[in-house]
């Protein structure tokens, strides 16, 4: 496993996930009967700061259809949590218009690079072009100054 599992932290994430799903109207319990489901949800709501009890609640009461989705959500959250610890692994997002993304993705594919690597390469190319243009302009001015003196 690449990322360490932190039981207390992840139990909090699981609790938040289940409460969010409940508030969105999803069935988070395995019970069909509304009163049994509400009773289980009420117990869950009282367990916010009880990580071990949250895991026990999940084992006893959670809707089996949510198991894989919750695992995926927690796995993604764990990855983001650990990546955020280091500047070089921290991720940022940008909004691109579809046509821009499409062109960037095509360029990245042709170059065999990731989108991030392609963006860095494009920035470096633009910086090099700018340096070259400045150097040429400076050489042109120096040459004109030399020719103008004679």
UniProtKB/Swiss-Prot annotation:
It is found in: Cytoplasm. GO terms for molecular function: sequence-specific DNA binding. Keywords: Cell cycle, Cell division, Cytoplasm, DNA-binding. Its main location: cytoplasm. GO terms for biological process: cell division; regulation of DNA-templated transcription. It holds the Pfam family MatP. Required for spatial organization of the terminus region of the chromosome (Ter macrodomain) during the cell cycle. Prevents early segregation of duplicated Ter macrodomains during cell division. Binds specifically to matS, which is a 13 bp signature motif repeated within the Ter macrodomain. This is Macrodomain Ter protein.
């Amino acid at each position: 496993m690449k990322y360490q599992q932190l039981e207390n932290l992840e139990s909090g994430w699981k609790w938040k996930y289940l409460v969010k799903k409940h508030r969105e109207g999803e069935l988070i319990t395995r019970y069909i009967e509304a009163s049994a489901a509400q009773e289980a949800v009420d117990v869950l709501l009282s367990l916010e700061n009880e990580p071990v009890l949250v895991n026990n609640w999940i084992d006893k009461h959670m809707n089996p259809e949510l198991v894989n989705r919750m695992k995926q959500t927690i796995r993604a959250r764990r990855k983001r949590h650990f990546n955020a610890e280091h500047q070089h692994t921290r991720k940022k997002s940008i909004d691109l218009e579809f046509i821009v993304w499409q062109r960037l993705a095509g360029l990245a594919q042709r170059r065999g690079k990731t989108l991030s690597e392609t963006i860095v390469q494009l920035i470096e190319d633009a910086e090099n072009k700018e340096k070259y243009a400045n150097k040429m302009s400076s050489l042109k001015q120096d040459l004109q100054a030399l020719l103008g003196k004679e």
